[in-house]
């Protein structure tokens, strides 16, 4: 019974404190998962000859190939943030801990969709002026399009999206692992990863509604941005009331001693 208090405390830590912080990230991953669809559709309307070329009969850089920029940005940004920016903030005495990193990352992912939404009407207008059929836009994936916006115009939204991912994804895994008790660390980390699947479920809920409403690409992106912003505020509220595990009162003496021993061996 004495050591059962340790388990009960870890159940409390996970269910009542970590879960409310993690659940709003389903809205974050809803946006991240949806970019592969929305941004590909946008790229179909753009000039795929981003490195030059005027041959109308061949495909240059297709949307799936252009999206590799996400991987390139991740490879660049993660080491910069972890190896230089976070230590720089610490040396300066700036409080940019895990919760604030996750908040910043969440916001940047929402912002990336707002950038895409602002660009969409101009891209569609330029595409329609060429006389091409919007319904067959996928057939023009990667093709040269005189008068269309270059696919490079998507670089800002990809950079902002990847910056958000680099801020919140590795930090979220670390946060849910360290802030959970020893017996719940695997469960807690898995729940963080599960939020990605919850994001896909949200897409399944909202996408048919937007399609039935006949929304344009830009309007749909604004709608997703608004929903993502709602999730962002949910996270901010949950984070504001969150108490770090080290500062939470223990259920009994055994739980307190176990926690002290754990933090004595863990640098965080």
At which residue positions do the language-model features occur?
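Hydrophobic transmembrane alpha-helices of multi-pass solute transporters/permeases
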Residues: 1-268
């Amino acid at each position: 019974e004495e050591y059962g208090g340790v388990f009960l405390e870890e159940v409390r830590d996970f269910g009542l404190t970590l879960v409310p912080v993690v659940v709003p990230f389903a809205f974050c991953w809803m946006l991240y998962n949806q970019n592969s669809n929305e941004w590909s559709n946008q790229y179909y309307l753009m000039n795929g000859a981003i490195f030059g070329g005027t041959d109308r009969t061949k495909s240059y850089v297709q949307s799936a190939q252009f999206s590799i920029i996400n991987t390139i940005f991740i490879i660049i940004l993660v080491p910069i943030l972890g190896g230089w920016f976070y230590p720089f903030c610490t040396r300066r005495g700036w409080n940019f801990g895990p919760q604030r990193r996750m908040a910043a990352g969440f916001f940047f992912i929402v912002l990336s969709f707002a950038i895409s939404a602002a660009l969409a009407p101009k891209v569609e207008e330029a595409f329609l002026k060429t006389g091409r059929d919007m319904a067959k836009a996928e057939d023009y994936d990667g093709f040269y399009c005189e008068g269309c916006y270059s696919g490079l115009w998507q670089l800002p939204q990809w950079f902002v999206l990847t910056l958000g991912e680099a801020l919140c994804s590795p930090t979220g895994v670390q946060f849910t692992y360290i802030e959970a008790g020893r017996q719940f660390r695997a469960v807690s980390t898995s729940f963080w990863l599960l939020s990605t699947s919850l994001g896909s479920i949200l897409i399944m809920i909202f996408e048919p509604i937007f399609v039935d409403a006949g929304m344009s690409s830009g309007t749909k992106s604004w709608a997703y941005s608004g929903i993502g912003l709602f999730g962002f505020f949910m996270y901010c509220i949950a984070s504001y009331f969150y108490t770090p595990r080290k500062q939470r009162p223990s259920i009994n003496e055994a739980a307190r001693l176990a926690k002290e021993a754990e933090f004595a061996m863990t640098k965080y």
